[in-house]
UniProtKB/Swiss-Prot annotation:
Cross-referenced Pfam families: DNA_gyraseA_C (PF03989), DNA_topoisoIV (PF00521)
Region (Disordered): 843-862
Family, as annotated: Belongs to the type II topoisomerase GyrA/ParC subunit family.
Protein name: DNA gyrase subunit A
Miscellaneous field: Few gyrases are as efficient as E.coli at forming negative supercoils. Not all organisms have 2 type II topoisomerases; in organisms with a single type II topoisomerase this enzyme also has to decatenate newly replicated chromosomes.
Species in which this protein is naturally found: Campylobacter fetus
Source organism phylogeny: Bacteria, Pseudomonadati, Campylobacterota, Epsilonproteobacteria, Campylobacterales
A molecular-function term among this protein's GO annotations: DNA binding
Catalytically driven reaction(s): ATP-dependent breakage, passage and rejoining of double-stranded DNA
Length: 862
């Protein structure tokens, strides 16, 4: 039978398990918080780091001493001060030796102490270590009773509760740790800036954060990088908590036909090898486009992660995607939590600076008291020796006649009024001290000691002198370490788009029948006079030809409308830039076109303002108007922009400011009921013009119609539209359309044979939508069919494209003005070729003014 361990008469206290667990967990929490995970606000060290440095100091491995095996150091730390696992202690030692972890390392390691690639250090039996100058500055004056000592874990030894720390180590090297219910993450800083900030605080106790930040600009990470924005820094310095955005530092190297992104500096605590692998994975999974190869060329001179781009990739866009998708951009969460007076607290920057200065003030006071006591003790001895020398004969006689040392000591104390210490010093004095030279040295030393006592006493009585000592020591530290900033701080990029990194230049965008697209700076095409023969705009495949082109800005958004009525988005700068004769890139690689889907219209726009609308014109004379804002949120698969009849296709789309819709007969919505429309008389034309803009459409057979924009009311994206013009000839079709602001504007029309003219808009009478129109250009075999129209603008040039792929730029003002019912003059000398498209482009300086143009006679067709 099992024996009952409790006797019947034994007193047993009942306890609540819940209360016991709470108390035990609280004790454990405080043990972790105070004794393990959080740094002291004064010296910036956790207990393990402090014990490592103290053990190294005991072993005498200073910055000028020989290296000592890491295993020996770890063994001393574990055996004397830190009864935990050797791995944890060695890891802490290793981190203090890594220049990519510490802004200024406290340990000088010899051997493999890890790398920025995440490689672990070699085993402690292979590596060696010693203290750096920084560690010596943290420990300086430790032997002068400057800090309190506490018993070690078994009360056999004592260890410092805090180090004297002549350096603001908490802010210099930062700290990170996870305790129970709390964590700290303090970033490192530049020592030069910290010293300047401390000196400013010494000079003005009431200085504000704004003034301090003129010196301490922000964190300074050992791996460099770029901090974006000061908002997070200010918040962290003000409240002790904040978020700092940190990016890798890169540069672009230009190579023939492609760019190379080179990463020079990494964000703090980013693993380079993992970053390399992550980028490679993103490229493999096609989550980032434009990268052909990633390789690591880092060496002892520094980091060099090379990212080679494809020929048509834009480095700015690829780099922006890398920042978004990888650890080339990270957020450093600041929590300035530290221990003060055995309590954890989140500190502001000013509080930490003041704590350090107060700590240094305490250290200097205790050091001064220690030195004063030592000086007074020495002066006391020297005064006794001086009395003995002044009475040397009597002293010698007394000693000679004394029975023993004790009687001699008592005799000296009684006869000359000396203390026991003084008497012992006299008895211990060598005979050589009786020489005249030694007497002079003694008197000089006494004088020097008395002056030192006076100086030390003055220091203790003057706070100003104490602050001057702190100031001098800080300046000494600054000159000794020379630690300039290596992390750049730039303006925040929250409001900066990738477009801000790309010049907003004039571009010519071309697209071929087979769907190859490219952009070329418009300055690549020199302006020529009328009749110029142009330059080759693109080299096409044998079965391909340029189908359309237009001019726009790099930052514009392109809206692609296809034969299926779908609309897609694409930024102009995302189109690969090519040479004037380059073939371009397949547009299916840029937007998500479906199989056999063909682009029919491309509309550039700078915004999606609700005050604007899109007017769609089809080959069969249908017009539809939809507010531009309907297309501002486009998915990658596109949206439906217009419903087309089976035998119809889109010709062009123009942008116009939205006008209030006028009421009209809904029977026109399907294109019927045209016979009910009445042509607006000339008298009513002006009144109608006052109400808003006009749409102007032209046909292949030289007809045109001008009607009020507000006669086409805005409808939804998936609607069909209404009739714009009825054709006189069966084979006729709409070939172009423009928006007219007022009747004083001029319209430029061009035919297939390069014949063109400028005509004022008031020569085309205003009609109701759905009419048959009037003659726009008199067509002859010499002119052939009409190609299109553009609005004349003195700030713009005309760009004409031929079927052979040639482009020519012509000054619009050089083209003769002619009436509505005329043919015009030669605008482009086609030499058997034909003009297939025209567009406007911004003016450029002409370098080709010697080209002579031929004119044709204007023909009156009225």
């Amino acid at each position: 039978m099992e024996e009952n361990i409790f006797s019947s008469n034994q007193d047993i206290d009942a306890i609540d398990v819940e209360d016991s667990i709470k108390a035990s967990y609280l004790d454990y929490s405080m043990s972790v918080i105070i004794g393990r995970a959080l740094p002291d606000a004064r010296d910036g060290l956790k207990p393990v780091h402090r014990r490592i440095l103290y053990a190294m100091n005991d072993l005498g491995v200073g910055s000028r001493s020989p290296y000592k095996k890491s295993a020996r150091i770890v063994g001393d730390v574990i055996g004397k001060y830190h009864p935990h696992g050797d791995t944890a202690v060695y890891d802490a030692l290793v981190r203090m030796a890594q220049n990519f972890s510490m802004r200024v390392p406290a340990v000088d390691g010899q051997g493999n102490f890890g790398s920025v690639d995440g490689d672990g250090a070699a085993a402690m039996r292979y590596t060696e270590a010693r203290m750096t100058v920084l560690a010596e500055e943290l420990l300086r004056d430790l032997d002068k009773d400057t800090v309190d000592f506490i018993p070690n874990y078994d009360d056999s030894l004592s260890e410092p509760d805090v180090l004297p720390a002549r350096v603001p180590n908490l802010l210099l090297n930062g700290s990170s740790g996870i305790a129970v219910g709390m964590a700290t993450n303090i970033p490192p800083h530049s020592l030069d800036e910290l010293v300047n900030g401390l000196l400013t605080l010494l000079d003005d106790k009431e200085v504000g954060l704004e003034d301090i930040m003129t010196h301490i600009k922000g964190p300074d990470f050992p791996t460099g990088g770029i901090i974006f924005g000061k908002k997070g820094i200010i918040e962290a310095y003000k409240t002790g908590r904040g978020r700092i955005k940190l990016r890798a530092k890169t540069h672009i190297e230009k190579k023939p036909n492609k760019d190379v992104i080179v990463v020079d500096e990494l964000p703090y605590q980013v693993n380079k090898a993992k970053l390399h692998a992550d980028i490679a994975d993103l490229v493999k999974e096609k989550l980032i486009d434009g990268i052909s190869e990633v390789r690591d060329e880092s060496d002892r001179d520094g980091i060099r992660l090379v990212i080679e781009l494809k020929r048509d990739a834009m480095s700015e866009i690829v780099l922006n995607n890398l920042f978004k998708s990888t650890q080339m951009e990270v957020t450093f969460g600041v929590i300035m939590l530290a221990i003060n007076n055995k309590e954890p607290k989140v500190f502001s920057l000013l509080e930490l600076l003041k704590l350090f200065l107060n700590h240094r003030k305490t250290v200097i006071i205790r050091r001064t008291i220690f030195e004063l006591q030592k000086a007074r003790a020495r002066a006391h001895i020297l005064e006794g020796l001086k009395i003995a020398l002044d009475n040397i004969d009597a002293v010698i006689n007394l000693i000679k006649t004394s029975a023993d040392t004790n009687s001699a000591r008592d005799g000296l104390m009684a006869k000359f009024g000396l203390s026991e210490l003084q008497s012992n010093a006299i008895l211990d004095m060598r005979l050589s001290k009786l020489t005249g030279l030694e007497r002079e040295k003694l008197e000089a030393e006494l004088k020097e000691i008395l002056e030192l006592i006076e100086k030390l006493d003055a220091i203790l009585k003057s706070e100003t002198l104490i602050e001057n000592i702190i100031r001098d020591e800080l300046l000494e530290i600054k000159s000794k370490f020379k630690c300039p900033r290596i992390t750049d701080i730039v303006d925040d990029y929250d409001d900066i788009d990738v477009e801000d990194l790309i010049p907003n230049e004039n571009m010519v965008v071309t697209i071929t029948h087979r769907g190859y697209i490219k952009r070329v700076p418009s300055k690549s095409y020199e302006k020529q006079k009328r009749g110029g023969k142009g330059k080759v705009a693109v080299t096409t495949y044998d079965d391909d030809f340029i189908e359309s082109f237009f001019t726009c800005m790099s930052h514009d958004t392109l809206m692609f409308v296809t034969d299926r009525g779908q609309l897609y988005w694409l930024k102009v700068y995302k189109i690969p830039e090519g040479s004037r004769t380059a073939k371009g890139k397949a547009v299916v690689n840029l937007i998500s076109l479906q199989a056999d889907e063909k682009i029919k219209a491309i509309i550039p726009t700078t915004d999606f303002d609700e005050s604007k609308s899109l007017a769609f014109f089809t080959k069969n004379g249908i017009v539809k108007r939809t507010n531009l804002s309907e297309f501002k949120n486009i998915r990658s698969i596109g949206v439906k922009a217009i419903n087309l009849d089976d035998n119809d296709e889109l010709v062009t789309v123009v942008i116009a400011n939205s006008e209030p819709d006028e009421s009209y007969d809904d029977s026109f919505e399907d294109g019927e009921g045209v016979s009910n429309l009445q042509t607006i008389s000339e008298d009513n034309s002006e009144n109608s013009l006052e109400s808003g803009k006009m749409l102007f459409a032209v046909t292949k057979k030289g007809m045109c119609i001008k009607f009020a924009l507000n006669k086409v009311r805005q409808i939804g994206r998936v609607s069909r539209g209404v009739t714009a013009i009825r054709f006189k000839e069966n084979l006729d079709e709409v070939v172009g359309a423009v928006v007219i602001e007022n009747d004083s504007q001029e319209i430029l029309s061009v035919s297939q044979k390069g014949i063109g003219k400028r005509t004022t808009a008031d020569e085309y009478r205003l009609q109701s939508r759905g009419g048959k129109g009037v003659i726009c250009m008199k067509l002859t075999p010499k002119t052939k069919d009409l190609v299109g129209v553009v609005m004349v603008d003195e700030e713009m040039d005309l760009m004409a494209l031929t079927s052979s792929g040639k482009m020519i730029r012509v000054d619009m003002q050089s083209i003769r003005k002619a009436g509505r019912n005329t043919s015009g003059v030669i605008v482009v000398n086609v030499d058997g070729d034909e003009v297939v498209s025209i567009a406007r482009c911004p003016k450029e300086e002409s370098d080709d003014d010697d080209i002579v143009a031929d004119d044709t006679q204007e023909q009156d067709m009225e």
